[in-house]
Amino acid sequence: MPQLIPFFFFNQVVFTLISLSFIFFVFSKYILPWIVRLYVSRNQYNSL
């Protein structure tokens, strides 16, 4: 099992951190602002 070999374990940890950082960046920069704008616009439209 390669997960138990320290070199591969370190490689998996680094890859996981990089992947999670990338996903966090994409969500915070692109996905979440789009959802918030949509929510606010619908909320303002319904309050009229």
From Swiss-Prot:
GO terms for molecular function: proton-transporting ATP synthase activity, rotational mechanism. InterPro entries: ATP_synth_su8_fun. The keyword Ion transport applies. Its main location: mitochondrion. One of its GO terms (cellular component) is proton-transporting ATP synthase complex. The chain crosses the membrane at residues 13-32. It is a single-pass membrane protein. It is found in: Mitochondrion membrane. Keywords: ATP synthesis, CF(0), Hydrogen ion transport, Ion transport, Membrane, Mitochondrion, Transmembrane, Transmembrane helix, Transport. F-type ATPases have 2 components, CF(1) - the catalytic core - and CF(0) - the membrane proton channel. Mitochondrial membrane ATP synthase (F(1)F(0) ATP synthase or Complex V) produces ATP from ADP in the presence of a proton gradient across the membrane which is generated by electron transport complexes of the respiratory chain. F-type ATPases consist of two structural domains, F(1) - containing the extramembraneous catalytic core and F(0) - containing the membrane proton channel, linked together by a central stalk and a peripheral stalk. During catalysis, ATP synthesis in the catalytic domain of F(1) is coupled via a rotary mechanism of the central stalk subunits to proton translocation. Belongs to the ATPase protein 8 family. This is ATP synthase protein 8. It comes from Trichophyton rubrum.
